């Protein structure tokens, strides 16, 4: 009896030690998310382990690894690390069917387990845009649909036009036949105009499996519209005698045919002076008969449009020459006897010292006009000098004052003055008396 009692005590003591040691042993795992087709790594750790075995099993409770021994024949499952404190395995080429709850077991008494959930993300397929048929007429209502399949969870679709997001769209989500992935579609409705021609409409698919790199589909719009026409003159102030070019700018899709020019609702009246070259109308040597309304008309398969230009030919402005005022020459009574001589060469030389170039640069770059003005001024100056010389020559002679006239030696004085002249003849005829 004593031996049996001691054996029982030993057994309970061993069990107590085992239970006490196992209280610090517990497997630790983490949930894993992986993209379909990727590789998932499942890790189970034990901080305190007294050589107790670890095991991984799949959602179907099939053992994958028991310590370092592979239990399931699946080439996709490999051992990463096996020790008393860790058991890690990898599952490559993960599919949607691999998703579920995996179990790590620590074989203590009792057995302790930890769960790790494997989430598999379904990658959405490249989106496709439908509903566009080229070409589209200006003003038509367009409906575009963007669709993508195979996403898990359901993907998000966004629309952009000219890099600006469009919010007013319709969104539809449908579950695929495998009941695991989704097909998502979005519809965009808008009315087009000519500004939409050549614009890229983008459908963008956002999903957590794409690693911040969204998938996109693009549709470039082709819009047909009637031409728009504008006439641009080569000068804003056409004058008589000048040339004028009228350019007809026309934009449309399809491209407009060659433009048609008319004047006042009829054909151009003077084809020799009014030459049409492409989209330009060239009018040579404008005159008053060219006044009128010119019309440019452009046509394509969608329609036609026109623009008008009213031509008014202005007169050439007259250039006024500067006038020169010649002062009148008057004589005043002289109270002393004076002999006056003239030297035309001296006056001419003093006048010729004027620099004609000083007049240049005052009235713009018309050198011919400036030269004419200078010539007129010089001519008038020379004429004035000539007339002044003739006047002084005719009045040259000997003059006596009243005092000289009553003096006794007046004849001698006259003779002295006459002799001083030397070259004068008939001095008596040159005498003048003032009373």
Curated annotation (Swiss-Prot):
Which pairs are disulfide-linked? 44-104, 146-203, 248-296
Extracellular compartment ranges equal 25-367
The record's listing under Pfam families reads: C2-set_2 (PF08205), Ig_3 (PF13927), V-set (PF07686)
What keywords were assigned to this record?
Answer: Cell adhesion, Cell membrane, Cell projection, Disulfide bond, Glycoprotein, Immunoglobulin domain, Membrane, Phosphoprotein, Repeat, Signal, Synapse, Transmembrane, Transmembrane helix
Instruction: Give me the ranges of the annotated region Disordered.
Output: 337-360
Q: Which residues carry this modification: Phosphoserine?
A: 423
Q: Where is the signal peptide?
A: 1-24
Residue intervals on the Cytoplasmic side:
389-435
Q: State any GO CC term.
A: plasma membrane
Ig-like V-type domain location is: 27-119
According to the entry, every stretch annotated as the Ig-like C2-type domain falls at: 127-219, 227-312
Give the GO terms filed under biological process for this record. Answer: cell adhesion
The UniProt transmembrane annotation reads 368-388
Annotated family: Belongs to the nectin family.
What's the protein name? Cell adhesion molecule 2
**Organism for this UniProt entry:** Mus musculus (Mouse)
């Amino acid at each position: 009896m004593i031996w049996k009692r001691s054996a029982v005590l030993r057994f309970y003591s061993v069990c107590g030690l085992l239970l006490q040691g196992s209280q610090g042993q517990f497997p630790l795992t983490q949930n894993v998310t992986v993209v379909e087709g990727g590789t998932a790594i499942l890790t189970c750790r034990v901080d305190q382990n007294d050589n107790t075995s670890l095991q991984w099993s799949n959602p179907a409770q099939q053992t994958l690894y028991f310590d370092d021994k592979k239990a399931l024949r699946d080439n996709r499952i490999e051992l990463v690390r096996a020790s008393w404190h860790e058991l890690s395995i990898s599952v490559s080429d993960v599919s949607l069917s691999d998703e579920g709850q995996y179990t790590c077991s620590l074989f203590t008494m009792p057995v302790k387990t930890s769960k790790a959930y494997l989430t598999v993300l379904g990658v959405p397929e490249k989106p496709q845009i439908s509903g566009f048929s080229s070409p589209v007429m200006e003003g038509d209502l367009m409906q575009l649909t963007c669709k993508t399949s195979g996403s898990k969870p359901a993907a998000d679709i966004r629309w952009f036009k000219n890099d600006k997001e469009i919010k007013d769209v319709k969104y539809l989500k449908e579950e695929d036949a495998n009941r695991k992935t989704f097909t998502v579609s979005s519809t965009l409705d808008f009315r087009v105009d000519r500004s939409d021609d050549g614009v890229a409409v983008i459908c963008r698919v956002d999903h957590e499996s794409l690693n911040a790199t969204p998938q996109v589909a693009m549709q470039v719009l082709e819009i047909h519209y009637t031409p728009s026409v504008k006439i641009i003159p080569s000068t804003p102030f056409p004058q008589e005698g000048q040339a004028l070019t009228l350019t007809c700018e026309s934009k449309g899709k399809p491209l407009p045919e060659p433009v048609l020019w008319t004047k006042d609702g009829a054909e151009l009246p003077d084809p020799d002076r009014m030459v049409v070259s492409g989209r330009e109308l060239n009018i040579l040597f404008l005159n008053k008969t060219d006044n009128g309304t010119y019309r440019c008309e452009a046509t394509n398969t969608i329609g036609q449009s026109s623009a008008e230009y009213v031509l008014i030919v202005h007169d050439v402005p007259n250039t006024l020459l500067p006038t020169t005022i010649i002062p009148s020459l008057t004589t005043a009574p002289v109270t002393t006897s004076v002999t006056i001589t003239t030297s035309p060469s001296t006056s001419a030389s003093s006048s010729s010292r004027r620099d004609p170039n000083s007049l240049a640069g005052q009235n713009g770059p018309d050198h011919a006009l400036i030269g004419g003005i200078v010539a007129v001024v010089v001519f008038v100056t020379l004429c004035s000098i000539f007339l002044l010389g003739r006047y002084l020559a005719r009045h040259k002679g000997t003059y006596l004052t009243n005092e000289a006239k009553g003096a006794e030696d007046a004849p001698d004085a006259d003779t002295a003055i006459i002799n001083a002249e030397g070259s004068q003849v008939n001095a008596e005829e040159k005498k003048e008396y003032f009373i």
